[in-house]
């Protein structure tokens, strides 16, 4: 099992992908201990002095004006967790739950939350033991933090709710803790609120969408290059000079990726020497422009989400150096919601452009290939309905890409009167990614079929590798057969990131 030494506020995108991708052991760097202890000492000093501070010895939300006696502070924190665990829907998978917990550990360890090191270590213990809290997918509006999902996460620390160990059966949390060799904990002043308040669920949802978008982008570049070759499209639109004079960095970098794949030393490239074709359709010619714009959106979202993954986003915040506790609004996940909306646009456009290239391949006048990429048309329908499936998926994504950040519903008796809807903004990215992966699967199949039909012509070594990868699982389409398994096989290869390995990373 891999290990990660967590330096608070210093997680990288590659580390976050590692956290999401598989179980690992977390160790908190000792440099964090002093700041954590100082913030707790500040909270204890406020209590000892009899001062009133929101979240430490008051109620919450609209009840913030209610002073809580010292004798009730432990019960206050426990009641907060129990009452706020009100989510609905299917539980999050182990990978997402683990990412949420690590994001929360990272935030709390910055030393601005007034939470004891022992509580943070208890959360680390869940991660290291492979304990997954039952966290329903729905129930947060992304302000005042992701209260419901983080409450469900925190229930497990208290021995409440449900959890499972290393992908096993869901159990009462006390049984899951016992199986993992762990004990329930008791929360002190402010600790329940520190656990519940924050954008970690929203950020994890959007990060999953970001990782999917990065993979889809790379796969789409490979599929688009394959289609360009199958359609005998020109390489000239990828000339670096075109893109340099526009100056759009995403476009420049996207064009370089196409050139990386479309080398000049191939039979198809040599076939263009006496070509009379002047211009290709936009779905081939404008790939660097469209995909470059998508890359820019993905990169900008990555920058926002990386900052949020390392942020302190609970409330109130403890500034121990000044012996001060300040109420603010870092729990508001508007940056995450807008980043997720931008990722949605990129995922939708990647699929939309791919679907147009598939349609081009179906049209014999455009591709100069047999209609629907099959011989003996009429008897055989070939890729006809596969393209319809791609169109259906691309169209569905257009609706799903509607921005969520422009929506808001007031909650908590209008105390929380503007919210981000970041969790929903991030969560819909998963369905969109699945749809676009389906579109790309059809394009990969169609491009490979078209290349097969260009008898005697081969493409570049990298693109031949992409064709070979597919042909190991899916044979050439000689006559009509049950088509769905072919699409599923291509989807599985895409999900396993086989095509992304043909390109350098695009976010770093």
From Swiss-Prot:
Pathway annotation from the record: Amino-acid degradation; L-histidine degradation into L-glutamate; N-formimidoyl-L-glutamate from L-histidine: step 1/3
Catalytic activity: L-histidine = trans-urocanate + NH4(+)
Keywords on record: Cytoplasm, Histidine metabolism, Lyase
One cellular component term from this protein's GO annotations in UniProt: cytoplasm
One GO term of the biological process aspect: L-histidine catabolic process to glutamate and formate
Coiled coil: none
Protein biosynthesis is among the record's keywords: no
Subcellular location: Cytoplasm
EC number: 4.3.1.3
UniProt-listed InterPro entries: Aromatic_Lyase, Fumarase/histidase_N, HutH, L-Aspartase-like, Phe/His_NH3-lyase_AS
Keyword hit for Cytoplasm: yes
Entry PTM: Contains an active site 4-methylidene-imidazol-5-one (MIO), which is formed autocatalytically by cyclization and dehydration of residues Ala-Ser-Gly.
5-imidazolinone (Ala-Gly) crosslink residues: 143-145
Modified residues (2,3-didehydroalanine (Ser)): 144
Name of the top EC class for this enzyme: lyase
GO MF, one annotated term: histidine ammonia-lyase activity
Xref: HAMAP family: His_ammonia_lyase (MF_00229)
PANTHER family, sorted: HISTIDINE AMMONIA-LYASE (PTHR10362)
Entries under NCBIfam families matching the protein: hutH, PRK09367.1
Annotated family: Belongs to the PAL/histidase family.
Protein name: Histidine ammonia-lyase
Species this protein is from: Klebsiella pneumoniae (strain 342)
Source taxonomy: Bacteria, Pseudomonadati, Pseudomonadota, Gammaproteobacteria, Enterobacterales
């Amino acid at each position: 099992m891999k290990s990660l030494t967590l330096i608070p506020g210093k997680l990288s995108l590659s580390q976050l992908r590692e956290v999401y991708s598989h179980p690992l052991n977390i160790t908190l760097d000792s440099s964090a201990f002093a700041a954590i202890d100082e913030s707790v000492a500040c909270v204890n000093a406020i209590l000892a002095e009899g001062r009133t501070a929101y979240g430490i010895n008051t109620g919450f939300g609209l009840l913030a004006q209610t002073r809580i006696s010292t004798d009730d502070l432990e019960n206050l924190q426990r009641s907060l967790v129990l009452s706020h665990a009100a989510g609905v829907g299917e539980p999050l998978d182990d990978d997402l739950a683990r990412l949420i917990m690590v994001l929360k550990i990272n935030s709390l360890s910055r030393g601005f939350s007034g939470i004891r090191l022992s509580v943070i270590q208890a959360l680390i213990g869940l991660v290291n033991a492979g304990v997954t809290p039952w966290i329903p997918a729905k129930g947060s509006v992304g302000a005042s933090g992701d209260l419901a999902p983080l409450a469900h996460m925190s229930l497990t620390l208290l021995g409440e709710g449900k959890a499972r160990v290393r992908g096993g059966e869901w159990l009462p949390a006390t049984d899951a803790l016992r199986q993992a060799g762990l004990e329930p904990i008791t929360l002190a002043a402010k600790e329940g609120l520190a656990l519940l308040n924050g954008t970690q669920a929203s950020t994890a949802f959007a990060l999953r969408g970001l990782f999917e978008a990065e993979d889809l982008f790379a796969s789409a570049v490979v599929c688009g290059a394959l289609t360009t070759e199958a359609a005998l499209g020109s390489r000239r639109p990828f000339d670096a000079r075109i893109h340099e004079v526009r100056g759009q960095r995403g476009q420049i970098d996207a064009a370089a990726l196409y050139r990386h794949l479309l080398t000049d030393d191939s039979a198809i490239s040599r076939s263009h020497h006496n070509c009379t074709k002047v211009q290709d359709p936009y779905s081939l010619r404008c790939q660097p422009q469209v995909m470059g714009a998508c890359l820019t959106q993905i990169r900008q979202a990555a920058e926002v989400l990386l900052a949020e993954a390392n942020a302190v986003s609970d409330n109130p915040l403890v500034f121990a150096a000044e012996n001060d506790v300040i109420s603010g609004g870092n729990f508001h996940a508007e940056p995450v919601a807008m980043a997720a909306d931008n990722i949605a646009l990129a995922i939708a456009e990647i699929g939309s452009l791919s679907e147009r290239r598939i349609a081009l391949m179906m049209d014999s006048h455009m591709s100069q290939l047999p209609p629907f990429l099959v011989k003996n048309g009429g008897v055989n329908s070939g890729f006809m309905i596969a393209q319809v499936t791609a169109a259906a998926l691309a169209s569905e994504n257009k609706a799903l890409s509607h921005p969520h950040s422009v929506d808001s519903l007031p909650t908590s008796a209008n105390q929380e009167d503007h919210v981000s809807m970041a969790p929903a903004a991030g969560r819909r990215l998963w369905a969109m990614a699945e749809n676009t992966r389906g579109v790309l699967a059809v394009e990969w199949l169609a491009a490979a079929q078209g290349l097969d039909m260009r008898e005697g012509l081969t493409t570049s070594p990298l693109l031949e590798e992409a064709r070979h990868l597919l042909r190991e699982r899916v044979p050439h389409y000689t006559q009509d057969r049950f088509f769905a398994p072919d699409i599923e096989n291509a989807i599985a290869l895409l999900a396993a990131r086989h095509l992304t390995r043909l390109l350098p990373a695009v976010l770093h």
